[in-house]
UniProtKB/Swiss-Prot annotation:
The lineage of its organism: Eukaryota, Viridiplantae, Streptophyta, Embryophyta, Tracheophyta. It is found in: Membrane. It is a multi-pass membrane protein. This is Hydrophobic protein LTI6B. The gene is LTI6B. Belongs to the UPF0057 (PMP3) family.
Amino acid sequence: MAGTANCIDILIAIILPPLGVFLKFGCGHEFWICLLLTFLGYIPGIIYAIYAITK
């Protein structure tokens, strides 16, 4: 269901941001953006993953 996230989703997004986004959206553009941001810096990847999962 879009717009909802439980504690496990958020925890996975903090530990490994691309995995959290992949589990929620699959291999779409959200995943690739998160992967790129995680490679550029771990914190931007976390911020984007939490944003994408909770929006």
